UniProtKB/Swiss-Prot annotation:
Catalyzes the attachment of alanine to tRNA(Ala) in a two-step reaction: alanine is first activated by ATP to form Ala-AMP and then transferred to the acceptor end of tRNA(Ala). Also edits incorrectly charged Ser-tRNA(Ala) and Gly-tRNA(Ala) via its editing domain. Residues 851-866 have a biased composition (Gly residues). This is Alanine--tRNA ligase. PROSITE patterns: AA_TRNA_LIGASE_II_ALA (PS50860). It catalyses: tRNA(Ala) + L-alanine + ATP = L-alanyl-tRNA(Ala) + AMP + diphosphate. Its cofactor is Zn(2+). Its EC number is 6.1.1.7. It comes from Rhizorhabdus wittichii (strain DSM 6014 / CCUG 31198 / JCM 15750 / NBRC 105917 / EY 4224 / RW1). One of its GO terms (cellular component) is cytosol. It comes from the Bacteria. The keyword DNA damage does not apply. Zn(2+) binds at H564, H568, C675, H679.
Length: 887
């Protein structure tokens, strides 16, 4: 028996020997066609070559292309497992000519491979041609096909087009006859839908260009595009009628049978087939960067996974099954597709996580389904409201409910399901607080309801293609925007990160046909799932539906990544240094800096800051890899991950691990956090970390502002320049600046002390406005007033204390006049404070000076006023207040 791997290799070798470039399979996510969810045909990676938009260094090519058909109009999901030839994932063998050879050589090459290399009997083959394609008919006759097995087909089945405009042309399909024991007739007959005649190869002759609906012209250089399903030709060459009986599928089905200890035929036949097919689709999609999600490609993958997981449940699997089948998949297909080998741990982990989480709700959902269908008869229809509850509460995609009821011959009310979905969206719209601008909020709800969320591709690439879904201008949707317009654009997919989790949104540019360029200034996420690109149309014009090329400002993103990863390292370092009470309270991650708010009751010491900086920079130097895993929030937190303050998490979270807690083999990660932001791939990419400020935000919350990379280097360079300038001014070397400053500070302190003593001596020696002639007697209390010039408020306290000491028992008041203002201090000896308050005396003086207030203790108080000319009045006011004190 010829293995599927041998068949693939022989096909590629056949065309390579004929001068064709051997082109590896492109990833399943198309990079040049934003209208496609997945690559679904072998020609997709060559689309721009056929249209002339891309030039390659070869004119003929051959490939085995990975394909997925599980969404949109190309959707085989519902039939998978129940027919002989439907698959979600399949391989398309093909040969292509870009203006090189045409019909005659294409037919000759196909014929020599099928009947020569592979030895398929010519009498088992039938071909079709487009009914007006006499050239193809004659070429098949020339090669030896009898007229009776060359069938003219007048329908679009035998005419291919890329779209409403562009390259197009007639097709010629090759069919294999499995024999009279299989029901069905030849193509074009009333019973052509039977399984006897199976199409194994389609040859497309691109010889025209569709200019518009009415005009079709000849292409100057006709091209060839062919496609052959590997699974179908493997069935033919292995002598079986059913694709699921070929070697690759048999191995996968045998593995699921062994692990579940169930028969692979009979009642469980469909379940084993679904699992085998969906395992292939899931494995290759994850290997090509698609992960389960609630939007876009990720949601299609989730539907595929959950459909397989329900069938695993039907087989009685008590534990997650799918991830245990991955080694069998890698064994069968890893040699041809090394990406499967490289991604095997990620594939296994993703499948296990998804199945573990889904199993938690699957049993409850199936119980609800059993209760709802218990009294139903074949042909009955499940109410749409029940199907929606299964979707909304238990995570059952609509098609999974359909599949679950298929064996019972029960239907589902799709219109009722859609009505329940619409009702929930209306309730969400009514509850939305939004920005407070009702019209603007309505626009984003409309866009989200019409298109769903934007698929974010920016974890793996900083540029990509997207289809323009909506244009918002001045808060309203418009169909077109021109140069100079300030707009917000929504595409079906984008590499631009939308502001969230403290990380600022991406900037960059968007380009398109006819010189279109849009400068993107920011990206936001209205409603949390739609990426809104805000910018200005620089040149050209743009309309909804246009294909666009989106390019993130790579330098800006690089700096943001470094800053974001640095916040994680800083968080861990703070907890290590200060204690586990430290938690993140907020952050701002920009391109030029970042700030990090955290819980801590007091300011950090210089030693704290130095130690934290050193620890973060040590991990940067160690340059450990940053890894990402998908987990449930509970599992992530149980594994030690820190959650971001104020963030809401869905059923699945990205867990970022970076650094090592120690250098021993097997050491735990230094930092583990839940985070949806973009990060460096290795810590060395941060380059340098520098704290530039630490301050209080509120009670119990501190803030650190910091720089990384080039910004940190420039900051340090500027500080170095300032140090050199200071050294020059001090006439010393930079290294000696601290010592020189210490000397100068001490000299200043000495001079200040000497000046204060001189002023005090002058004051005690008598002032210009009043002179102490000894204490007065006021109501039996000794009262010593003084008015002095040029003494600052700080010097008053010492004078008052000296006066109190000289009095033994009494009251001292000193008024100092400076630059037109006056300061006053009053002192009361300890034996009098129960009767006389220095505070009351000062308040009386301050009022006389034109001021307000004044305060202190009963034995010492100070205040001041703006009118220094009233110094004598202030003394008099104190004298009057003292005279009124009861004896």
């Amino acid at each position: 028996m010829t293995s599927t791997n041998d068949i693939r290799r022989s096909f590629l070798d056949h065309f390579a020997k004929e001068g064709h470039e051997l082109v590896p399979s492109a990833p399943l996510v198309p990079h040049n066609d934003p209208t496609l969810m997945f690559v679904n045909a072998g020609m997709v990676p060559f689309k721009n070559v056929f249209t002339g938009l891309e030039k390659r260094p070869y004119s003929t090519a051959t490939s085995s292309q990975k394909c997925v058909r599980a969404g949109g109009k190309h959707n085989d999901l519902d039939n998978v497992g129940y027919t002989a030839r439907h698959h979600t994932f399949f391989e398309m063998l093909g040969n292509f000519s870009f203006g090189d050879y045409f019909k005659e050589r294409a037919i000759s090459l196909a014929w020599s491979l099928i009947t020569g290399t592979w030895g398929i009997p010519a009498d088992r083959l039938t071909v079709t041609v487009f009914h007006t394609d006499d050239e193809a008919f004659d070429l098949w006759k020339k090669i030896g096909m009898p007229d009776s097995r060359i069938i003219r087909i007048p329908t679009s089945d035998n005419f291919w087009s890329m779209g409403d405009t562009g390259p197009c042309g007639p097709c010629s399909e090759i069919f294999y006859d499995h024999g009279a024991h299989i029901p069905g007739g030849p193509p074009g007959s009333p019973d052509e839908d039977g399984d006897r005649f199976v199409e194994i190869w389609n040859l497309v002759f691109m010889q025209y260009e569709q200019v518009d609906k009415e005009t079709r012209i000849d292409l100057p250089r006709p091209s060839i595009d062919t496609g052959m399903g590997l699974e179908r030709i493997a069935a033919v060459l292995q002598g079986v009628h059913d694709n699921y009986d070929t070697d690759t599928f048999k191995a996968l089905i045998a593995a699921s049978g062994e692990l579940t200890r169930t028969a692979t035929n009979g009642d469980f036949k469909a379940s084993h087939r679904v699992i085998a097919d969906h395992l292939r689709a899931s494995g290759f999609l994850v290997a090509d960067g698609v992960l389960p999600a609630n939007e876009g490609r990720g949601y299609v993958l989730r539907r595929i996974m959950r459909r397989a997981m329900r069938h695993a449940h039907l087989l009685g699997a008590a534990e997650p099954l799918m991830h245990r089948l991955v080694p069998s998949l890698v064994a069968e297909m890893g040699a041809a597709y090394p990406e499967l080998v490289r991604a095997q741990p990620l594939i296994e982990e993703t499948l296990k996580l998804e199945e573990t989480r889904f199993r938690q709700t699957l049993a409850n959902g199936l119980r609800l389904l059993d209760e709802a269908t218990g009294a139903m008869k074949p042909g009955d229809v499940l109410p749409g409201a029940v199907a929606f509850k299964l979707y909304d509460t238990f995570g059952f995609p609509y098609d999974l409910t359909e599949d679950a009821l298929r064996a019972q011959d029960l239907g589902v009310d799709r219109s009722g399901f859609d009505a329940a979905m619409a009702e929930q969206k209306a309730a969400a719209r009514a509850a939305w607080k939004g920005s407070g601008e009702k019209a603007s909020d309505e626009v984003w709800f409309d866009i989200a309801e019409e298109f769903g969320g934007t698929e974010f591709t920016g974890y793996v690439s900083e540029e990509g293609d997207g289809q323009l879904l909506a244009i918002v201008k001045d808060g309203q949707r418009v169909a077109e925007a021109k140069a100079g317009d300030e707009v917000v654009l929504v595409t079906n997919q984008t590499p631009f990160y939308g502001e969230s989790g403290g990380q600022m949104g991406d900037a960059g540019r968007i380009t398109g046909d006819d010189g279109l360029e849009i400068a993107v200034e920011d990206t936001a996420k209205p409603l949390g799932r739609v990426h809104a690109h805000r910018g200005t149309v620089v040149s050209g014009s743009v309309r909804t539906g246009d294909a666009l090329h989106l390019v993130v400002d790579g330098d800006r993103r690089t700096r943001i990544r470094a800053n974001h990863s640095a916040t994680h390292l800083l968080h861990a370092a703070l907890r290590n240094r200060l204690g586990s009470h430290v938690t993140q309270k907020g952050s701002l991650v920009a391109a030029d800096r970042f700030r990090f708010d955290f819980s801590h009751p007091k300011a950090l010491t210089p030693e704290d800051i130095a130690a934290i900086e050193a620890e973060v920079n040590r991990h940067i130097r160690e340059n450990d890899e940053v890894t990402t895993r998908l987990m449930t929030p509970d599992a992530a937190i149980e594994a030690g991950a820190m959650a971001l303050f104020g963030e809401k998490y869905g059923d699945e979270v990205r867990v970022l691990s970076m650094g090592k807690a120690g250098r021993d083999l097997g050491a735990k990660s230094y930092s583990v956090e839940l985070c949806g932001g973009t990060h460096v791939s290795a810590l060395g990419d941060i380059a340098l970390f520098k704290i530039i400020s630490e301050s209080a935000v509120s009670s119990g919350v501190r803030r650190i502002e910091a720089l990384t990379g080039e910004a940190a280097r420039q900051w340090l360079t500027q500080r170095d320049e300032k140090l050199k300038e200071a050294a020059a001014a001090l006439k010393t070397a930079p290294d000696d600046v601290p010592a020189r400053i210490a000397v100068l500070v001490e000299e200043r302190r000495k001079l200040e002390r000497e000046l204060a003593e001189a002023k005090k001596a002058l004051a005690l020696g008598g002032g210009s406005k009043a002179e102490a002639a000894g204490p007065e007697d006021v109501a039996g209390v000794k009262f010593l007033p003084q008015v002095v010039d040029g003494l600052d408020p700080k010097g008053l306290r010492g004078l008052v204390d000296d006066a109190k000491a000289s009095l033994g028992s009494g009251v001292s008041v000193i008024v100092a006049v400076n630059d037109g203002r006056a300061s006053v201090a009053a002192g009361v000896t300890a034996d009098l404070v129960d009767r006389i308050s220095a505070v009351d005396l000062v308040k009386a003086a301050v009022a006389a000076l034109g001021g307000q207030g004044g305060g202190g203790r009963p034995d010492m108080a100070q205040g001041g006023g703006p009118d220094g000319d009233k110094a004598a009045d202030a003394v008099a006011a104190v004298r009057d207040a003292l005279a009124k004190v009861p004896a």
